[in-house]
Amino acid sequence: MTSLATLPVGPVRRVAFLGTPALAVPVLEALVHDGVDVAHVVTRADKRRGRGSELSPSPVKECARRLGIPVGHSVEELLDLHRRAPVDLGVVVAYGALVKPHVLRELPMVNIHVSLLPRWRGAAPIERALLAGDSETGVCIMQVEEGLDTGGVLATARMPIGRDTTADDIRSRLIADGTTLLLRQLRDGLSVPVPQEGEPTHAAKIEPDELRIDWSRSAEEISRLVRLGGAFTTHRGGRLKVHRAEVIDTESTHRGPGSVRVARDSIEIGAGIGAIRLIEVQPENKARMNASAWANGAKPGSDEVLGGG
Protein backbone atom coordinates (compact mmCIF):
# COMPACT_ATOMS: atom_id res chain seq x y z
CA MET A 1 0.00 0.00 0.00
CA THR A 2 1.24 3.47 -0.93
CA SER A 3 2.35 5.76 1.89
CA LEU A 4 -0.09 8.65 1.76
CA ALA A 5 0.62 12.32 2.25
CA THR A 6 -0.56 13.44 5.67
CA LEU A 7 -3.94 15.14 5.83
CA PRO A 8 -3.72 18.78 6.95
CA VAL A 9 -4.48 19.77 10.53
CA GLY A 10 -6.86 22.64 11.20
CA PRO A 11 -9.07 24.58 8.77
CA VAL A 12 -8.43 23.98 5.07
CA ARG A 13 -8.52 27.11 2.94
CA ARG A 14 -6.61 26.31 -0.26
CA VAL A 15 -7.52 23.29 -2.39
CA ALA A 16 -7.29 21.76 -5.83
CA PHE A 17 -10.47 20.29 -7.32
CA LEU A 18 -10.72 17.16 -9.46
CA GLY A 19 -14.08 16.46 -11.10
CA THR A 20 -15.78 16.03 -14.44
CA PRO A 21 -19.60 15.62 -14.77
CA ALA A 22 -22.47 17.95 -13.97
CA LEU A 23 -23.05 16.48 -10.51
CA ALA A 24 -19.62 17.79 -9.43
CA VAL A 25 -20.43 21.37 -10.47
CA PRO A 26 -22.49 22.38 -7.39
CA VAL A 27 -19.68 21.18 -5.14
CA LEU A 28 -17.14 23.37 -6.94
CA GLU A 29 -19.51 26.32 -6.83
CA ALA A 30 -20.14 25.80 -3.10
CA LEU A 31 -16.42 25.76 -2.34
CA VAL A 32 -15.94 29.09 -4.07
CA HIS A 33 -19.06 30.57 -2.47
CA ASP A 34 -17.81 29.49 0.96
CA GLY A 35 -14.56 31.37 0.46
CA VAL A 36 -12.30 28.39 -0.17
CA ASP A 37 -9.37 29.24 -2.43
CA VAL A 38 -9.70 26.77 -5.32
CA ALA A 39 -6.26 27.18 -6.84
CA HIS A 40 -6.62 24.76 -9.73
CA VAL A 41 -9.15 22.43 -11.34
CA VAL A 42 -8.37 19.14 -13.07
CA THR A 43 -10.99 17.49 -15.28
CA ARG A 44 -11.13 14.84 -17.96
CA ALA A 45 -10.18 15.74 -21.53
CA ASP A 46 -12.74 17.29 -23.87
CA LYS A 47 -14.93 14.73 -25.66
CA ARG A 48 -16.49 14.69 -29.09
CA ARG A 49 -20.26 14.98 -28.81
CA GLY A 50 -23.24 15.49 -31.08
CA ARG A 51 -23.72 14.94 -34.77
CA GLY A 52 -20.84 17.19 -35.70
CA SER A 53 -18.50 15.35 -33.33
CA GLU A 54 -17.18 18.67 -32.07
CA LEU A 55 -14.94 18.70 -29.02
CA SER A 56 -16.95 19.67 -25.96
CA PRO A 57 -15.58 20.56 -22.51
CA SER A 58 -16.79 18.81 -19.38
CA PRO A 59 -19.37 20.58 -17.19
CA VAL A 60 -16.68 21.10 -14.54
CA LYS A 61 -14.36 22.71 -17.07
CA GLU A 62 -17.10 25.09 -18.16
CA CYS A 63 -17.80 25.96 -14.52
CA ALA A 64 -14.12 26.56 -13.75
CA ARG A 65 -13.81 28.92 -16.71
CA ARG A 66 -16.92 30.80 -15.61
CA LEU A 67 -15.48 31.16 -12.10
CA GLY A 68 -12.07 32.23 -13.41
CA ILE A 69 -10.22 29.21 -12.00
CA PRO A 70 -7.24 27.77 -13.90
CA VAL A 71 -8.25 24.40 -15.36
CA GLY A 72 -6.30 21.58 -16.98
CA HIS A 73 -6.47 17.89 -17.81
CA SER A 74 -3.27 16.64 -16.21
CA VAL A 75 -2.83 15.46 -12.64
CA GLU A 76 0.92 15.60 -13.30
CA GLU A 77 0.58 19.30 -14.06
CA LEU A 78 -1.37 19.71 -10.82
CA LEU A 79 1.43 18.00 -8.91
CA ASP A 80 3.98 20.35 -10.46
CA LEU A 81 1.85 23.36 -9.50
CA HIS A 82 1.49 21.98 -5.97
CA ARG A 83 5.26 21.75 -5.63
CA ARG A 84 5.66 25.40 -6.63
CA ALA A 85 2.60 26.82 -4.82
CA PRO A 86 1.30 24.21 -2.36
CA VAL A 87 -2.39 23.58 -1.74
CA ASP A 88 -3.66 22.07 1.51
CA LEU A 89 -5.77 19.36 -0.05
CA GLY A 90 -7.14 17.84 -3.23
CA VAL A 91 -10.94 17.47 -3.38
CA VAL A 92 -12.21 14.75 -5.72
CA VAL A 93 -15.82 14.53 -6.95
CA ALA A 94 -16.56 12.06 -9.76
CA TYR A 95 -13.26 12.74 -11.49
CA GLY A 96 -13.54 9.58 -13.56
CA ALA A 97 -10.08 8.08 -13.08
CA LEU A 98 -7.90 6.75 -10.30
CA VAL A 99 -5.24 9.10 -8.95
CA LYS A 100 -1.81 7.53 -9.25
CA PRO A 101 0.04 6.51 -6.07
CA HIS A 102 3.01 8.85 -6.55
CA VAL A 103 0.61 11.82 -6.58
CA LEU A 104 -1.01 10.71 -3.32
CA ARG A 105 2.41 10.51 -1.70
CA GLU A 106 2.77 14.28 -2.13
CA LEU A 107 -0.76 15.68 -2.20
CA PRO A 108 -3.40 14.44 0.28
CA MET A 109 -6.89 14.08 -1.18
CA VAL A 110 -10.43 13.44 -0.04
CA ASN A 111 -13.36 12.28 -2.12
CA ILE A 112 -17.15 12.64 -1.92
CA HIS A 113 -18.43 9.10 -2.50
CA VAL A 114 -22.18 8.55 -2.80
CA SER A 115 -22.65 5.32 -0.87
CA LEU A 116 -22.25 3.94 2.64
CA LEU A 117 -18.81 2.44 2.26
CA PRO A 118 -17.69 -0.28 1.97
CA ARG A 119 -21.01 -1.07 0.28
CA TRP A 120 -20.98 -0.06 -3.38
CA ARG A 121 -17.43 0.87 -4.14
CA GLY A 122 -17.04 1.78 -7.79
CA ALA A 123 -18.57 3.67 -10.69
CA ALA A 124 -22.33 3.35 -10.11
CA PRO A 125 -23.08 3.32 -6.36
CA ILE A 126 -26.42 5.14 -6.59
CA GLU A 127 -27.70 2.93 -9.38
CA ARG A 128 -26.61 -0.31 -7.70
CA ALA A 129 -28.12 0.65 -4.35
CA LEU A 130 -31.45 1.35 -6.03
CA LEU A 131 -31.46 -1.81 -8.16
CA ALA A 132 -30.52 -3.97 -5.17
CA GLY A 133 -33.52 -2.70 -3.22
CA ASP A 134 -31.40 -1.18 -0.44
CA SER A 135 -33.57 0.53 2.18
CA GLU A 136 -31.02 3.28 2.71
CA THR A 137 -27.90 4.75 1.21
CA GLY A 138 -25.68 7.70 2.02
CA VAL A 139 -22.61 9.74 1.26
CA CYS A 140 -19.09 9.58 2.67
CA ILE A 141 -16.15 11.93 2.81
CA MET A 142 -13.25 9.51 2.43
CA GLN A 143 -9.50 9.77 2.09
CA VAL A 144 -8.28 8.90 -1.40
CA GLU A 145 -5.78 6.08 -1.51
CA GLU A 146 -4.43 3.70 -4.13
CA GLY A 147 -7.38 1.28 -4.04
CA LEU A 148 -10.79 1.97 -5.56
CA ASP A 149 -12.85 3.71 -2.85
CA THR A 150 -10.98 1.88 -0.09
CA GLY A 151 -9.81 4.85 2.00
CA GLY A 152 -10.75 5.70 5.56
CA VAL A 153 -14.02 7.57 6.14
CA LEU A 154 -14.00 11.05 7.70
CA ALA A 155 -17.75 11.77 7.76
CA THR A 156 -21.04 10.15 6.71
CA ALA A 157 -24.66 11.15 6.09
CA ARG A 158 -27.52 8.70 5.48
CA MET A 159 -30.81 8.84 3.59
CA PRO A 160 -33.71 6.37 3.22
CA ILE A 161 -34.68 4.95 -0.16
CA GLY A 162 -38.47 4.92 -0.41
CA ARG A 163 -40.74 3.06 -2.82
CA ASP A 164 -40.96 6.11 -5.10
CA THR A 165 -37.39 7.38 -4.73
CA THR A 166 -35.62 7.82 -8.07
CA ALA A 167 -31.93 7.79 -8.88
CA ASP A 168 -32.16 11.53 -9.56
CA ASP A 169 -33.70 12.06 -6.11
CA ILE A 170 -30.83 10.17 -4.49
CA ARG A 171 -28.19 11.95 -6.54
CA SER A 172 -29.50 15.43 -5.69
CA ARG A 173 -29.84 14.67 -1.98
CA LEU A 174 -26.44 13.00 -1.60
CA ILE A 175 -24.52 15.66 -3.49
CA ALA A 176 -26.18 18.32 -1.31
CA ASP A 177 -25.45 16.36 1.87
CA GLY A 178 -21.92 15.56 0.72
CA THR A 179 -21.24 19.21 0.00
CA THR A 180 -22.43 20.16 3.49
CA LEU A 181 -20.19 17.51 5.06
CA LEU A 182 -17.21 18.61 2.99
CA LEU A 183 -17.56 22.30 3.84
CA ARG A 184 -17.90 21.46 7.53
CA GLN A 185 -14.74 19.34 7.38
CA LEU A 186 -12.80 22.11 5.65
CA ARG A 187 -13.98 24.79 8.09
CA ASP A 188 -13.52 22.81 11.30
CA GLY A 189 -10.54 20.69 10.35
CA LEU A 190 -10.50 17.18 8.92
CA SER A 191 -11.59 14.29 11.10
CA VAL A 192 -9.33 11.30 11.60
CA PRO A 193 -10.16 8.76 8.84
CA VAL A 194 -11.82 5.61 10.18
CA PRO A 195 -10.99 2.38 8.32
CA GLN A 196 -13.94 0.84 6.49
CA GLU A 197 -15.56 -2.16 8.16
CA GLY A 198 -17.73 -4.88 6.66
CA GLU A 199 -17.90 -6.83 3.43
CA PRO A 200 -17.36 -4.59 0.38
CA THR A 201 -19.59 -4.75 -2.68
CA HIS A 202 -18.69 -3.49 -6.14
CA ALA A 203 -20.85 -1.00 -8.03
CA ALA A 204 -20.08 -1.85 -11.65
CA LYS A 205 -21.06 0.59 -14.37
CA ILE A 206 -24.59 0.07 -15.68
CA GLU A 207 -24.46 -1.61 -19.09
CA PRO A 208 -27.04 -0.53 -21.72
CA ASP A 209 -28.71 -3.94 -21.90
CA GLU A 210 -29.34 -3.88 -18.14
CA LEU A 211 -31.92 -1.16 -18.82
CA ARG A 212 -34.09 -3.54 -20.88
CA ILE A 213 -37.13 -4.50 -18.80
CA ASP A 214 -37.41 -8.22 -18.11
CA TRP A 215 -41.12 -8.66 -17.50
CA SER A 216 -40.55 -12.03 -15.83
CA ARG A 217 -39.05 -10.17 -12.86
CA SER A 218 -41.22 -8.93 -10.00
CA ALA A 219 -43.13 -5.67 -10.24
CA GLU A 220 -40.98 -4.27 -7.42
CA GLU A 221 -37.78 -5.03 -9.33
CA ILE A 222 -39.18 -3.51 -12.52
CA SER A 223 -40.21 -0.39 -10.60
CA ARG A 224 -36.66 0.02 -9.31
CA LEU A 225 -35.31 -0.24 -12.85
CA VAL A 226 -37.74 2.42 -14.08
CA ARG A 227 -36.76 4.71 -11.21
CA LEU A 228 -33.15 4.29 -12.26
CA GLY A 229 -33.89 6.14 -15.51
CA GLY A 230 -33.53 4.90 -19.08
CA ALA A 231 -35.58 1.70 -18.74
CA PHE A 232 -37.10 0.41 -21.96
CA THR A 233 -39.12 -2.40 -23.48
CA THR A 234 -40.39 -3.10 -26.99
CA HIS A 235 -43.82 -2.89 -28.62
CA ARG A 236 -44.44 -4.15 -32.13
CA GLY A 237 -40.73 -4.17 -32.81
CA GLY A 238 -40.11 -0.56 -31.72
CA ARG A 239 -38.42 0.61 -28.56
CA LEU A 240 -40.70 1.98 -25.86
CA LYS A 241 -39.02 3.87 -23.02
CA VAL A 242 -40.74 3.77 -19.66
CA HIS A 243 -40.09 7.00 -17.77
CA ARG A 244 -42.59 6.60 -14.93
CA ALA A 245 -44.58 3.71 -13.56
CA GLU A 246 -46.07 2.54 -10.28
CA VAL A 247 -46.53 -0.85 -8.65
CA ILE A 248 -50.22 -1.77 -8.38
CA ASP A 249 -49.88 -5.44 -7.42
CA THR A 250 -47.06 -7.17 -5.55
CA GLU A 251 -48.42 -10.70 -5.18
CA SER A 252 -50.38 -12.14 -8.11
CA THR A 253 -48.78 -14.53 -10.57
CA HIS A 254 -51.75 -15.10 -12.90
CA ARG A 255 -50.93 -12.18 -15.22
CA GLY A 256 -48.59 -13.10 -18.03
CA PRO A 257 -45.24 -11.26 -17.95
CA GLY A 258 -45.51 -8.26 -20.29
CA SER A 259 -49.25 -8.74 -20.81
CA VAL A 260 -51.20 -5.53 -21.46
CA ARG A 261 -54.49 -4.62 -19.82
CA VAL A 262 -56.15 -1.32 -20.72
CA ALA A 263 -58.78 -0.29 -18.19
CA ARG A 264 -60.18 3.21 -18.71
CA ASP A 265 -57.11 5.44 -18.34
CA SER A 266 -55.00 2.77 -16.62
CA ILE A 267 -52.41 0.84 -18.64
CA GLU A 268 -51.48 -2.22 -16.59
CA ILE A 269 -48.59 -4.52 -17.44
CA GLY A 270 -48.18 -7.95 -15.90
CA ALA A 271 -44.92 -9.02 -14.30
CA GLY A 272 -43.55 -12.34 -13.09
CA ILE A 273 -44.94 -11.40 -9.70
CA GLY A 274 -47.47 -8.56 -9.54
CA ALA A 275 -48.10 -5.78 -12.03
CA ILE A 276 -47.27 -2.15 -12.73
CA ARG A 277 -49.22 0.74 -14.17
CA LEU A 278 -47.51 2.78 -16.87
CA ILE A 279 -47.63 6.54 -16.23
CA GLU A 280 -45.26 8.12 -18.76
CA VAL A 281 -43.68 6.51 -21.80
CA GLN A 282 -41.79 7.46 -24.95
CA PRO A 283 -42.29 5.56 -28.20
CA GLU A 284 -39.35 5.32 -30.57
CA ASN A 285 -38.65 8.62 -32.39
CA LYS A 286 -41.40 10.42 -30.47
CA ALA A 287 -41.66 12.73 -27.47
CA ARG A 288 -42.47 11.67 -23.93
CA MET A 289 -46.18 11.29 -23.33
CA ASN A 290 -48.78 10.17 -20.84
CA ALA A 291 -49.24 6.42 -21.04
CA SER A 292 -52.96 6.75 -21.74
CA ALA A 293 -52.19 9.02 -24.72
CA TRP A 294 -49.80 6.38 -26.02
CA ALA A 295 -52.44 3.67 -25.61
CA ASN A 296 -55.06 5.78 -27.39
CA GLY A 297 -52.76 6.01 -30.40
CA ALA A 298 -51.07 2.62 -30.36
CA LYS A 299 -54.17 0.72 -29.24
CA PRO A 300 -52.33 -2.24 -27.71
CA GLY A 301 -54.47 -5.37 -27.76
CA SER A 302 -55.13 -7.65 -24.82
CA ASP A 303 -53.31 -10.42 -26.69
CA GLU A 304 -50.13 -8.36 -27.05
CA VAL A 305 -47.05 -8.71 -24.88
CA LEU A 306 -44.51 -5.95 -24.24
CA GLY A 307 -40.92 -6.99 -24.74
CA GLY A 308 -41.82 -9.67 -27.22
CA GLY A 309 -39.90 -8.06 -30.07
Functional labels for PLM-detected ranges:
Residues 2-51:
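N-terminal Rossmann-like dinucleotide-binding module
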Residues 77-86:
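Short amphipathic alpha-helix with an adjacent loop that forms part of the alpha/beta core around
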Residues 2-8, 197-309:
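Internal anion-binding site segments
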Residues 70-75:
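Short acidic-hydrophobic, aromatic-tinged amphipathic segments that line or gate anion-handling sites
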Residues 31, 62-68, 134, 226:
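A generic structural signal for well-ordered alpha-helical segments
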Residues 47-65:
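N-terminal beta-loop-helix "entrance" segment that forms/cooperates
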